[in-house]
């Protein structure tokens, strides 16, 4: 199923490699974000004051245990968000990689994938009616962060068969005065279109972050192509793995003999490099797929103005 939860599970599977964490189950709904008493089946063996557990993407800190299955808790522990939970929801005890941290890493990777250096994006459109007396158009409802770059500007033609000729001369100005351009964006057209007809702007937009609390949301809401659904878990696993070697270097506890002999320093870094190589290859493939779908058209140049715009200007 293509949901955020599936991404979380894929990330955790890569990091744990078959290791099974201790689980329990809620025996009563958590219907309020201020509720500080939680009941579980009690099948987990480690319930005690100081234990941390998670339900969905919320972390809880146990402040007391009564009867083996009634827990007094702090809510929203560790920077997670307190929310409601249903009866029979799964409880993960002392998770090595909390869900909320995995979701944060997934969003960090979606942002990274949207970098021009990585070449992934979602294509979106907006439109407005052309007015011959107006040169600059406000891109209402958008923000500068939502537009990486504009791909094309076309307008509705008239005739027996409607076409959409391309406007090749335009420029996008950011950080405009919001009293004139409420979005802070001004699209300046240097060539005309048909008055009263729709102008359509296609633009490359960053991938959309996933919800930190609704793990049932579909992955398609990010704007990522289905063929690239394997990328965010790879990036998230890499990000979470980078902090793993730090713990073994703490000076307040002696490392186990297994750490010293079976998992020598550098072993974790080798696993990280394997993930990085796999992600790099997949990223190149998906970026190439987008280039093929939306090829660069060198005749399109927002910096070029028609000759009429330069008339009357001196050479010096």
What does each model-found stretch correspond to?
Residues 1-32, 45-60, 69-70, 83-316:
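Glycine-enriched, solvent-exposed interface loops adjoining structured elements
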Residues 43-44, 64-69, 75-81:
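Acidic glycine-/aspartate-rich tracts in secreted/extracellular proteins
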């Amino acid at each position: 199923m293509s949901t955020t939860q599936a991404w979380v599970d894929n990330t955790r599977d890569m990091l744990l490699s078959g290791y099974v964490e201790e689980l329990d189950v809620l025996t009563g709904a958590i219907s309020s974000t201020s509720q500080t008493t939680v009941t579980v089946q009690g099948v987990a063996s480690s319930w005690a004051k100081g234990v941390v557990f998670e339900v969905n993407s919320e972390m809880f800190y146990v402040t007391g245990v009564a009867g083996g299955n009634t827990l007094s808790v702090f809510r929203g522990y560790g920077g997670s968000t307190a929310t409601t939970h249903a009866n029979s929801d799964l409880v993960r005890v002392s998770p090595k990689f909390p869900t909320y941290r995995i979701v944060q890493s997934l969003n960090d990777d979606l942002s990274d994938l949207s970098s021009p250096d990585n070449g992934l994006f979602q294509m979106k459109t907006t439109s407005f009616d052309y007015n011959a007396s107006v040169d600059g158009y406000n891109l209402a409802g958008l923000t500068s962060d939502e537009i990486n770059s504009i791909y094309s500007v076309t307008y509705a033609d008239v005739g027996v068969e409607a076409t959409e000729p391309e406007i090749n001369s335009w420029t996008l100005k950011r950080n405009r005065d919001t009293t004139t351009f409420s979005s802070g964006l001004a699209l300046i057209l240097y060539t005309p279109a048909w008055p009263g007809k729709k102008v359509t702007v296609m633009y490359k937009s960053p991938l959309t972050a996933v919800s930190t609390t609704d793990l049932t949301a579909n992955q398609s809401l990010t704007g990522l192509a289905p063929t690239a659904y394997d990328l965010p878990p790879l990036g998230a696993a890499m990000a979470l793995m980078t902090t793993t070697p730090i713990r073994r270097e703490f000076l307040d506890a002696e490392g186990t003999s297994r750490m010293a002999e079976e998992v020598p320093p550098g072993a974790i870094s080798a696993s990280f490099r394997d993930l990085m190589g796999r992600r790099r290859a997949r990223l190149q493939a998906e970026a190439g797929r987008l280039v093929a779908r939306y090829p660069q058209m060198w005749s399109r140049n927002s910096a070029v103005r028609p000759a009429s715009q330069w008339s009357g200007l001196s050479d010096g």
